[in-house]
Amino acid sequence: MAAPRQPEEAVDDTEFIDDHHDQHRDSVHTRLRANSAIMQFQKILVANRGEIPIRIFRTAHELSLQTVAVYSHEDHLSMHRQKADEAYMIGKRGQYTPVGAYLAIDEIVKIALEHGVHLIHPGYGFLSENAEFARKVEQSGMVFVGPTPQTIESLGDKVSARQLAIRCDVPVVPGTPGPVERYEEVKAFTDTYGFPIIIKAAFGGGGRGMRVVRDQAELRDSFERATSEARSAFGNGTVFVERFLDRPKHIEVQLLGDNHGNVVHLFERDCSVQRRHQKVVEIAPAKDLPADVRDRILADAVKLAKSVNYRNAGTAEFLVDQQNRYYFIEINPRIQVEHTITEEITGIDIVAAQIQIAAGATLEQLGLTQDRISTRGFAIQCRITTEDPSKGFSPDTGKIEVYRSAGGNGVRLDGGNGFAGAIITPHYDSMLVKCTCRGSTYEIARRKVVRALVEFRIRGVKTNIPFLTSLLSHPVFVDGTCWTTFIDDTPELFALVGSQNRAQKLLAYLGDVAVNGSSIKGQIGEPKLKGDIIKPVLHDAAGKPLDVSVPATKGWKQILDSEGPEAFARAVRANKGCLIMDTTWRDAHQSLLATRVRTIDLLNIAHETSHALANAYSLECWGGATFDVAMRFLYEDPWDRLRKLRKAVPNIPFQMLLRGANGVAYSSLPDNAIYHFCKQAKKCGVDIFRVFDALNDVDQLEVGIKAVHAAEGVVEATICYSGDMLNPSKKYNLPYYLDLVDKVVQFKPHVLGIKDMAGVLKPQAARLLIGSIRERYPDLPIHVHTHDSAGTGVASMIACAQAGADAVDAATDSLSGMTSQPSIGAILASLEGTEHDPGLNSAQVRALDTYWAQLRLLYSPFEAGLTGPDPEVYEHEIPGGQLTNLIFQASQLGLGQQWAETKKAYESANDLLGDVVKVTPTSKVVGDLAQFMVSNKLTAEDVIARAGELDFPGSVLEFLEGLMGQPYGGFPEPLRSRALRDRRKLDKRPGLYLEPLDLAKIKSQIRENYGAATEYDVASYAMYPKVFEDYKKFVAKFGDLSVLPTRYFLAKPEIGEEFHVELEKGKVLILKLLAIGPLSEQTGQREVFYEVNGEVRQVSVDDKKASVENTARPKAELGDSSQVGAPMSGVVVEIRVHDGLEVKKGDPIAVLSAMKMEMVISAPHSGKVSSLLVKEGDSVDGQDLVCKIVKA
């Protein structure tokens, strides 16, 4: 074997150097050459990838060396290729696997020889510990930057290293005397020494081929996995076995040796913070190692190296137990990932020393004698990887969309493929960058690392930054007392607070709108308003502008808060005027704009509202349809809306609509769900609960009333008005309503509500009904709600005020009339100066309306197209809130041209169902039946005659079954019996048949699926499980869109248009749409380019109009325990089951290999395998559906 070539033996390179200088006269290498007296070589190749070649290239350039990179086809866009002076692909495309390319010894040596390379540095991993590679490099006449091949063979084999330590009288952990290849040998060791043990690959490191086994049941599978991983990673499946030490520290010593037998140490590093035996965070020097133990470890490390004439850089590794006894593990004959922290505390460039030693320099020539080497301060290194800690550190793949590094004093970054646009594949190690920070003390260095981690911005792939931040902030790490299994032993480390990634998620939504248009259901076209809304200026009685920078602080809310619900009710009743409830924030936009007004637009006028309506009875702003629509269509949290509005309007009581035993859902729920919901609503800001039941079922109503009482809210027990009580032939007459009032009063409500949802309460009927109630209950406050569908709303509300009502409903003028509430301006003008004066400033109310006039144009895509009042409502009795939705639904069902027929069918459907009170959800039942009749061309007679064979809408069957309560006068027969066939018939309120919800379990499930859970989340889930889950998934993808101005929520900006998004106080994004790229026929995507705070970002968006074959695998659905998903991206290397096989919980299903790691996919529960969707060799992404396991 040829000896390593030394400078004095080198061939004459004059011709090469002359040619090189002719070609590169102006290169940096020529200018630097004078600074390198020792270096006589000209070109170095690094046989590696990622960050270590870049690290080596930088030092090589400082030493005036030309640099050569090699790369696999999969790495053709990697950064290390660009950082070298020359770069050559290993083999041809498809010739090698992604990892195999970097293990292709002959090919790499061939490239080096063809391109005049003098030195080859192996980096770490891959061929760095391969003696054959080192030997072939030197046999080819080049210099291997590392130990001799003989040293690699003797020390790289951990068994040989162990025998060496025993000869040198260095302590070792009890273990097998040599390598083992058979399971029986491992079994024999455990029979002698017991458990726990550790199985280690005899060649290589980095945690591959390493398994801790704690009992006999795990032994065989762990042995097979360790040998398989070792064979895949290092080409040799040999392993050895040791006794496993519990909670030791992992201390390693950095060594340097020259070609003349000289060896020095560069002190120690503490590498105890590990996961699966792979180092995560390293510290230099070790913080709490006793001085005498440190000195003995350092001396033994040097003794071991000298005993084998160690050359170049290496690391001696030790375990230190809790009694400070230390044991030699191995010597790694290569540079380590964590060499950076030693460089930071010693000031020594280890890579430069490596190269110069390889070139023949002595330690003395380099000034590296032991007496000259000392440490200063501390350094800590973190490895930032594309791993998802919340999913067992499964590697994430994809495109890095944003990459912003940390920096500043004491921060060193050694990067690899961390840059915007980089594609992270499953083929290689997941590390993006090493972040090393130094400080004069351990605590200063620790704080600096935490600051640097928080400063990083990496988007497009998951990273371990949240986990690292949690780790470095843990008290044990702060104390510096971690051990090797600290991460596994400390589950609280995984209570992560991740980066919100708000800007990039927002861009994903904006990009989708730019490519595909708005996806908001019900939107037709784009907003008519293109400019900004001009906010009104309010003036006081003296004509001076009001300061609306802060909200008003005096109103009926203060009476309620200070004196309680009973006193509040007495004060309302004692008030001489008729108060106003403004419905603009809920029912008005529900009736005219499909409930689509967003929180941001309510908040923009909230302070002005608190001043202008300071004397209002309440603001109706929550509950009813706004609750589910917020999540379903606006992608907002209704609780967040309530919290924000409450803060902005502290002086006016907030009123919500509560559907009795339904809560805000469309069907009955268990009683405990209603009580829980009301408690959360009261806590979050609701004051007055307008409780009603769609059928005026007193038993249903009682549940809601008692729940509000328990929550200590204001109970407004509400009776729904339907029909025409002046018509003696109608079902609902005055005695009916008075009897209802008598029953409701028994529940001790604070206020009585009358809910005229269709606007059919005529003025003369209003006088009779309100007057009769007032006469019977002179001390009970009365509040009347109506719609102006017939155009008589103002007259009816004035009649109510004159008859003794304490509060009536109205909406801002621009959102009033038709299916909405009567005009507030008209009511104020009618009552102004009378004994019923509401006490509001008409000028301020009118000023407020200028905002809503503009805003209605912004929401023009949701207009129903109504042009005026519809007195026909007295016939069909369609509720105002339903009428606009019914028009839209009819259009969607292709019945738009049959609207008149639909209205007549609504009357017929109502008669068929027994003339029910029509309000959500019973109004939906009537509407569904009406559309069903029109679609199927059915008459009322047809429905009755064919009821036994027709497939009725679900809502109709639920009503007939009794799931919505008991209607006045009973269910219609024979329709009910015929339609239900074999379904049950309930004769009591449905809640009595429902089991209480397990609210604690719901909270646990939410936390498990989404990382956090509040009681508000539980309440939302209880009302609308599927809607809540869809909303959470949407937010996970696109973030909180409630901060986005409505114009850009509904339509894309113009190219080059700049707009602002305020994420929170003091944090504003300045955005500009730059371009929309062409369609990629391969992916069906377009690239959308935005400027964000002056920085160009891009997002890839699926073009929904493109026809691209969808080859994506189905995903395992969260929450469905029968579906088994891939825990990470990778290749399926083994399938252990087949369809129909019975498995037990924990049985292996398949084995994945990714990023040089293997992972067994286990059965989550016992059952039978079905729908096995993968086979050996398949590539899968994280959460791809592998199979289903049907529970036994």
UniProtKB/Swiss-Prot annotation:
Organism domain of life: Eukaryota
Residue ranges annotated for the Pyruvate carboxyltransferase domain, each copy included: 578-846
Chain spans, region Disordered: 1-23
Any one GO MF annotation of this record: metal ion binding
Residues with N6-biotinyllysine modification: 1156
Active-site residue numbers: 334
Annotated InterPro entries: Aldolase_TIM, ATP-grasp, BC-like_N, Biotin_BS, Biotin_carboxylation_dom, Biotin_COase_C, Biotin_lipoyl, Carboxylase_cons_dom
Transmembrane stretches, start-end: none
Keywords annotated in UniProt: ATP-binding, Biotin, Cytoplasm, Gluconeogenesis, Ligase, Metal-binding, Multifunctional enzyme, Nucleotide-binding, Pyruvate, Zinc
Functional note: Pyruvate carboxylase catalyzes a 2-step reaction, involving the ATP-dependent carboxylation of the covalently attached biotin in the first step and the transfer of the carboxyl group to pyruvate in the second.
PANTHER family per UniProt: PYRUVATE CARBOXYLASE (PTHR43778), PYRUVATE CARBOXYLASE, MITOCHONDRIAL (PTHR43778:SF2)
Protein name, UniProt field: Pyruvate carboxylase
Organism per entry: Aspergillus niger
Gene, per the UniProt record: pyc
